[in-house]
């Protein structure tokens, strides 16, 4: 065997062993359940009847997760429920004002006043520092929860925000 062949064989063996090591680490971490589940848009409460937004999902790490409103809603939509999801950025979240005076609270009040026979459910999924890429991603999954409407209050972060001109991604 020539010197070049031995050299290439050794490089191949080192690369194979390195890859095998990384695969072993990955399998071990998965087997022991390390990390968090980022696949689901919503997480369940302990009793499994209610859902709430998984803020860490795909977009932010645990330390960077934005502080959205924690809105619980029934997993199964009730017969007499009118369900609206609100997607948006910090303005839709109500920032910088308290949650109880944000537009979805006022909308819920007005809808309950005009439709007293309906159970009005407005779930605000707004997060800071997101844009229409996130809205699109959320909306694809929201249709499975039988919304009667999806309100999108966004646009502020399209130009200067995530994946905009001010982004480094």
Regions found by a protein language model. Name each.
Residues 32-110, 114-115:
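Membrane/wall-proximal cationic-aromatic binding patches
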Residues 104-107, 118-133:
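Mobile, glycine- and charge-enriched loop segments
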Residues 35-44, 133-169:
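Interaction-surface signature
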Residues 83-86, 121-126, 149-153:
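Structural recognition of the beta-strand scaffold that forms the well-ordered cores
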Residues 10-27:
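Hydrophobic membrane-insertion alpha-helices, especially the h-region
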Residues 2-11:
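Membrane-helix interfacial "entry" motifs
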Residues 90-93, 127-132, 156-160:
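Solvent-exposed loop/turn segments at secondary-structure junctions
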